[in-house]
Amino acid sequence: ELRLSLREIRTALDAYKQAVEEGRVAHAAQDSGYPESLQVLVDGVPDASSPDRKKWIYFLRQVPRDPMFPDPSLPNEETWGKRSYASSHEAPEEGDDVFDVYSLAPGTGLNGIPYRKW
């Protein structure tokens, strides 16, 4: 389930970036083109290509929960680590956008890879 949740979020992040590149999502020139938060993927954004901007684009129905995260009391979005576009893969940090997500859960998968590295 972790792999599926990661794939769902990463696919939505890529779709958002693609919509920015196609001019369907308004953004500032200096922005990376990735959303400010995972919640933006659920809340949606106005379709800039729609003549009256009444059409919205949604990328997720809801933010999936990290199935390995130990605390069930936190909201789904807070169960993920978020990496900004400006941070490195080796040392992911939050920032002005969400470029990628990773598991915050301790532990290692059956494949020997820590959940954080999936």
Regions found by a protein language model. Give the residues of each.
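Aliphatic-rich helix starts adjacent to a transmembrane/signal segment
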Residues: 1-6
